[in-house]
């Protein structure tokens, strides 16, 4: 009996122990992260079943009970919703399409089985034809969806905030206009006409726009996966004709090949850059044919950059070389991929001609006039490179540089855009002279947000277009700030005077013989060369933008057009914005208020030369040479004087008078009066004669006594 009781107690103890262990195991599994996720998935699956099944279904109770029992709940009183009739069970194809496309856009939720197109790659290794949709019957002229005119004063109104429709800034600008009347000369308002069309892009991600050089063709690129290249043609009555829609990988850069280039003989060729490290040369068929587009050449950047050096596979910037680049083949393609600069030859294989790593490079620009010269925006500075040299660069120090562009009509002007996303620093544009890198020529301020695009005008060398995230498109006029100057040029130079002297002697070759010799001898004595202004010169006034277009959305890309709309005498600017709209803007080029307009008039060319005493001057200059100045060509320099007295250091000075020169046959535009000829007293130079020189250098005391030649005037030729 005792043995039976002991066995029963042992059994009860083991049962209690097993129950205690089961509770501990249940507590551990219930509080673990994996169990919580499983419970959540069971609850979610339970709700899905209870929603999609009808309560009248006899198998409803069983299915619901199974789901709720797995969750540990009762089945009584469970409320269910009727199953929708249009419900479709999710298939494997839909799941792939959902994860392969962008889920934010409703058009991407459709599967390939519903649209009738299976998942396939647009490009294959042995398939060099892109898919284009061209239906001659569906080609029709598109009318603009909006047409408005923007009237702005100079300086322009402050940029508004577009968080909510608030136009109080217009009233404030009108109140400020009265204060500006005393400072700036008022001019009539400038009207900017804008037309816009909605591009049928499903992704709503327009990235680039390009305008043909000789024909009214516009190419618009999108970052979508299909149907992302649109080709349009502008008509005379401000209409737009849609010709083709082509499927390429996500496009981030477009450039039309110039008709003057060798490859362009095949037809309309478009250079494209994509987000997968590829660049193409695409041959577009005739606009009124149904032939597909053809890829002439493909450039793969991934094969030439190691994986560890690859920061981004997106190619945003590409450019084509000009005929001035004699070191490369005509129509060579330059691209920027993951801080590496590539130069491709379309006639060669898949190997680039040149590869150069540029640290922190975000954008670049090729010089259209100088062979091998490249400017790269590298964040904290702008780097000037010569691709013909193995290494070496010149840096222009200016922070937050994200864009740069060489002027297509001036070989020395370079524009850089500086933007700060954090808003701690200003957003501005700086104009540089590539020959003088000490500091910028001008600083253009006015944008309140990041600058997205930078484009020089194709008609005026002094006009610059910029667009920003603040919703403004601005036209800057720096004509009075960077005008044509008299030769020798009037620049502030702080470098080596000896090198500057050699440069002046070379620039003096265009003068007549006697005047050229006078200038070269004057340079030997003058402490400040002739083309250096006095330090106490007047401070340059800031350049103002002449017109602007205020939009509700930021412009993603800007391109200067080579055509003018009907009824407008101003060039056009083509833009694409973030909402999928294409805009054509006619922006007038007004004269800034802070300068006086130039009045062309015919002037008499006179000579004004500063003379210096020299022992060898009597032997070099004769009366015949001096009188020859009166018989020179009409291109006598207006900066030279009509009469000068040359005095030697001998007791019997030789005097000669040059008669007045003939009137010039060309017209000049002068904004300030000429200074009269300088009357310089007799000076005797002292000191040792330098080797290799035919004149004596004056002493330091006499050198300081020499006055500086003040040539502070504006001179330019007009047609």
Swiss-Prot record:
Biased composition (Basic and acidic residues): 691-703
SMART domains (alphabetical): WD40
InterPro entries on file: WD40/YVTN_repeat-like_dom_sf, WD40_repeat_dom_sf, WD40_rpt, WD_repeat_RBAP46/RBAP48/MSI1
GO molecular function list: histone binding
Polar residues bias (residue ranges): 30-39, 48-68
Record has Cell division as a keyword: yes
Chain positions covered by the region annotation Disordered: 1-144, 677-707
WD repeats, residue ranges: 201-242, 246-294, 310-354, 396-442, 446-486
GO biological process: cell division; cell wall organization; chromatin remodeling; regulation of DNA-templated transcription
Entry's Gene Ontology cellular component terms: cytoplasm; nucleus; Rpd3L complex; Rpd3L-Expanded complex
Superkingdom as given in the UniProt entry: Eukaryota
Keywords: Cell cycle, Cell division, Cell wall biogenesis/degradation, Repeat, WD repeat
Residue stretches of biased makeup (Basic residues): 18-29, 122-136
Record function comment: Involved in cell wall metabolism and required for the separation of the mother and daughter cells.
Sequence similarity: Belongs to the WD repeat DSE1 family.
Name this polypeptide is given: Protein DSE1
Gene symbol of the encoding locus: DSE1
């Amino acid at each position: 009996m005792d043995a039976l009781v002991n066995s029963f107690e042992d059994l009860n103890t083991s049962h209690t122990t097993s129950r205690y262990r089961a509770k501990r195991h249940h507590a551990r599994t219930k509080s673990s992260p994996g169990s919580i996720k499983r419970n959540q998935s069971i609850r979610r699956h339970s709700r899905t079943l209870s929603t999609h099944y009808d309560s009248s279904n006899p198998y409803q109770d069983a299915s619901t009970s199974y789901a709720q029992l797995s969750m540990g709940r009762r089945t009584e009183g469970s409320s269910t919703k009727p199953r929708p009739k249009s419900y479709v069970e999710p298939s494997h194809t839909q799941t792939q399409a959902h994860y392969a496309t962008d889920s934010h856009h409703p058009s991407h939720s459709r599967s390939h089985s519903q649209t009738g197109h299976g998942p396939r790659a647009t490009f294959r290794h042995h398939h060099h034809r892109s898919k284009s949709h061209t239906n001659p019957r569906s080609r029709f002229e598109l009318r603009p969806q909006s047409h408005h005119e923007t009237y702005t004063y100079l300086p322009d109104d402050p940029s508004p905030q577009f968080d909510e429709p608030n136009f109080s800034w217009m009233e404030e600008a009108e109140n400020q206009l009265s204060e500006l009347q005393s400072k700036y000369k008022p001019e009539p308002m400038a009207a900017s006409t804008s037309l816009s069309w909605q591009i049928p892009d499903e992704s709503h991600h327009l990235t680039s726009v390009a305008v043909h050089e000789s024909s009214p063709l516009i190419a618009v690129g999108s970052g979508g996966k299909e149907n992302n290249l649109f080709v349009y043609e502008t008509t005379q009555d401000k209409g737009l004709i849609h010709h083709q829609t082509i499927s390429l990988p996500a496009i981030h850069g477009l450039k039309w090949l110039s008709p003057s280039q060798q490859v362009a003989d095949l037809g309309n060729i478009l250079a494209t850059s994509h987000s997968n490290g590829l660049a193409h040369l695409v041959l577009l068929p005739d606009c009124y044919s149904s032939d597909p587009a053809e890829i002439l050449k493909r450039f793969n950047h991934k094969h030439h950059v190691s994986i560890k050096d690859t920061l981004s596979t997106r190619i945003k910037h590409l450019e084509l070389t000009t005929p001035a680049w004699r070191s490369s083949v005509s129509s060579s393609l330059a691209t920027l991929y993951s801080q590496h600069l590539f130069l491709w030859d379309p006639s060669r294989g898949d190997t680039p001609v040149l590869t150069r790593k540029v640290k922190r490079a975000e954008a670049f620009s090729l010089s259209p006039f100088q062979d091998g010269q490249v400017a790269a925006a590298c964040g904290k500075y702008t780097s000037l490179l010569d691709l013909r040299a193995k290494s070496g660069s010149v840096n222009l120090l200016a922070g937050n540089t994200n864009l740069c562009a060489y002027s297509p009509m001036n070989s020395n002007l370079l524009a850089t855009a500086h933007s700060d996303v954090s808003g701690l620093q200003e957003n501005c544009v700086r104009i540089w002279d590539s020959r003088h890198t000490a500091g910028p020529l001008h600083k253009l301020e006015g944008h309140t947000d990041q600058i997205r695009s930078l484009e020089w005008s194709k008609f005026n060398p002094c006009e610059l277009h910029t667009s920003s995230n603040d919703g403004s498109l601005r036209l800057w006029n720096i004509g009075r700030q960077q005008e044509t100057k008299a030769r020798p040029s009037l620049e502030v130079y702080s470098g080596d005077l000896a090198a500057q002297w050699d440069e002046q002697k070379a620039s003096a070759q265009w003068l007549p013989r006697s005047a050229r010799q006078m200038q070269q001898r004057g340079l030997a004595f003058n402490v400040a060369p002739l083309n250096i202004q006095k330090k106490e010169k007047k401070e340059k006034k800031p350049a103002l933008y002449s017109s602007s277009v205020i939009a509700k959305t930021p412009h993603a890309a800007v391109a200067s057009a080579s055509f003018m709309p009907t009824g407008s005498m101003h060039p056009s600017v083509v833009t694409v914005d973030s909402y999928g709209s294409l805009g054509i803007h006619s922006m007038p080029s007004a004269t800034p208020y802070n300068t006086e307009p130039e009045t062309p008039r015919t002037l008499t060319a006179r000579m004004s030369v500063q003379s210096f005493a020299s022992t060898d001057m009597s032997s070099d200059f004769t009366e015949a040479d001096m009188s020859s100045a009166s018989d020179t060509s009409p291109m006598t320099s207006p900066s030279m004087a009509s009469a000068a007295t040359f005095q030697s250091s001998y007791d019997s000075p030789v005097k000669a008078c040059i008669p007045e020169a003939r009137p010039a046959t060309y017209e000049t535009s002068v904004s300030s009066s000429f200074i009269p000829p300088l009357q310089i007293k007799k000076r005797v130079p002292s000191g040792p004669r330098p080797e290799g020189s035919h004149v004596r250098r004056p002493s330091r005391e006499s050198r300081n006594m020499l006055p500086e030649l003040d040539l502070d005037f504006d001179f330019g030729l007009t047609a």
